[in-house]
């Protein structure tokens, strides 16, 4: 299946036809969509054509049509064969991208890799580029044959890449997450470090240059946690180990994190109360000698209600 990337100068956007969330003006039912979680259903199936049936990969070169700029734009397919052809019979979605701050020609993308479109068994697929996205290498999957989902990539200021992924060794094992580290621009990864984790996890890395430089923060859905009741963790040693899971001051799910210029940590997510988006702040999560405390929790009004799986696109992919 074709999986492509568009570049304009040094910015990157991955285009895939999926939409998981939407806003509506009327309040939805007061419920948490607990059916939305990752679990192993189908068995693994190898590619039906042994990755030998190929077609031309997607490729585009052009310029923007803006009246105020004349910017070069190019598109390249990422999940390609060694001969840079499209592989028939596989599929990919939920991409996450990271760029090396020390060398912007080095780019890594991770995604959910389906080797066979007749099975929803997914793996931790990835590809890397060393020439700014012009050409790509697709080695396959981290942990081949192991169920993975929810890929999240980030990088630190030293040029290391990190791949956070839910991983289950067998169908009854649900929601454990591991963080994999690459020191060679995505060519290879370590064996991964268990971080606790859970469904719909996200990750960010402190690049503020302060006390928390290199800290890794992650949170996930509380009611699908591998270490209940916790749904937050932190690494202060570059992903070599992670703190015991802890709770946040409010139950936030489908969330993300961000680090401020002074190293303060923000976590945002949807509340179980319709129409509420919450933001929690910690100023001491950056301090490796302290357990994070949370100084404030704010409610953000978006002028509507976030709903999941709207009629326009009920599957979200």
Segments the model singles out, each with a brief description of its role:
Residues 1-26:
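Bacterial Sec-dependent N-terminal signal peptides
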Residues 23-317:
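C-terminal PAP-associated
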């Amino acid at each position: 299946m074709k999986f492509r990337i568009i570049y304009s100068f040094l910015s990157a956007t991955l285009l895939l036809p999926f939409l998981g969330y939407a806003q509506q003006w009327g309040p939805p039912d007061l419920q948490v969509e607990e059916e939305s979680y990752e679990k192993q259903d189908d068995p693994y199936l190898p590619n039906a054509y042994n990755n030998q049936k190929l077609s031309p990969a997607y490729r585009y070169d052009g310029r923007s049509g803006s009246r105020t700029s004349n910017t070069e734009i190019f598109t390249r397919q990422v999940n390609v064969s060694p001969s840079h052809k499209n592989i028939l019979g596989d599929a990919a979605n939920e991409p996450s991208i990271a760029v090396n701050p020390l060398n912007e020609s080095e780019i890594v993308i991770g995604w959910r890799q389906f080797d066979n479109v007749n099975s929803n068994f997914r793996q931790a697929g990835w590809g890397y580029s060393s020439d700014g996205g012009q050409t790509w290498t697709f080695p396959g999957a981290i942990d081949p044959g192991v169920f993975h989902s929810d890929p999240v990539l980030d990088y630190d200021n030293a040029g290391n890449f990190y791949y956070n992924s839910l991983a289950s060794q067998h169908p009854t094992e649900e929601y454990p997450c591991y963080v994999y580290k690459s020191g060679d621009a995505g060519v290879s990864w370590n064996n991964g470090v268990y971080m606790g984790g859970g469904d719909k996890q996200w990750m960010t890395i402190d690049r503020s240059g302060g006390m928390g430089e290199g800290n890794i923060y992650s949170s996930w859905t509380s009611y699908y946690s591998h270490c209940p009741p916790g749904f937050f963790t932190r690494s202060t040693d570059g992903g070599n180990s992670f703190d015991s899971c802890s709770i946040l001051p409010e139950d936030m799910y489908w969330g993300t994190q961000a680090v401020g210029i002074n190293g303060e940590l923000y976590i945002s997510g949807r509340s179980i109360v319709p129409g509420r988006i919450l933001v929690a702040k910690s100023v001491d999560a950056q301090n490796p000698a302290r357990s994070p405390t949370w100084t404030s929790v704010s409610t953000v009004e978006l002028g509507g209600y976030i709903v999941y799986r709207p009629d326009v696109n009920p599957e979200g992919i």
